[in-house]
């Protein structure tokens, strides 16, 4: 394929231009953000500069956009989970497979034994996970507790696989990348927060149409996250786990054409989502009511993830809303992070 001349700017496709789910913020955002942010900061997982950048990312906003109808208790569970995810993400990104495997073992032991105090000399992620789950499980049905533990284990195993890829400098092909990304995105355990007060039976949950809805949602989340995070990831030399880099590598193309590929794939996924939605069976009440609320949550998650990406300072500093309108970005120069944790975006370069 003939490449376009290298440009210092590129455009992020507006993948949700026709997405019918509107932005809705949980009314308990302010109080639950304050509680969860203070709780997270108290663990001292990052140095001062990284903690400041972490706070500006406002992962509590992501939770409160993703769970707009959640009770205060479940809203807090969502906030704590998002903060836990990104503590794990930031720490695991700087280590190889062996260390990340140990991190996974610590976290899963904490999740499976939430009332057991963690050793003082252990990686702090274990205690964060333990406290999160000890509080969150109180508001979760037994079946949703099981699903959370199973899916969180899958998520962490994929993070280990990602570390193994880093160790070997592996660049996956599109198909195998999407397979691992469906787990590293953390969507499956995130969806469990939506069903904490539900008892959706396994036969309903495993229904083929229901699973198609979930898969289309997860894939849209993966693509949506990767297109907004690509710029800072390429700048930090950490873009090997990003669909833009994967498409560029496999199709021997450039950033604009890779973004076009993502946009076309996203449109296809939207069609798959609404086709599955129209084919969803009925099971009678109360199951149909639970399923309706859950499916609304899936569609809303897609909007929430996109909104947070621009409203927070995670990817674009304070220029997020401006970039959300213009869609244009300047390619950030390469930079090596000075410490573990998120880094402030130099928005003067965007």
Curated annotation (Swiss-Prot):
Superkingdom of origin: Eukaryota
Motif (D(D/E)XX(D/E) motif): 89-93
Top EC group: lyase
Site (Plays a critical role in the stabilization of intermediate cation): 86
Short motif NSE motif, span: 225-233
Positions that bind Mg(2+) 2: 89
UniProt KW keywords: Calcium, Cobalt, Lyase, Magnesium, Manganese, Metal-binding, Nickel
Cofactors, names only: Mg(2+); Mn(2+); Ca(2+); Ni(2+)
One Pfam family recorded for the sequence: Terpene_syn_C_2
Similarity comment: family membership: Belongs to the terpene synthase family.
Function: Terpene cyclase that catalyzes the cyclization of farnesyl diphosphate (FPP) to delta(6)-protoilludene. In presence of Ca(2+), a significant switch from 1,11 to a dual 1,11/1,10 cyclization occurs, producing beta-elemene as the major product, with lower levels of delta(6)-protoilludene and (E)-beta-caryophyllene, and traces of beta-selinene and alpha-selinene.
Protein name according to UniProt: Delta(6)-protoilludene synthase STEHIDRAFT_64702
Organism: Stereum hirsutum (strain FP-91666) (White-rot fungus)
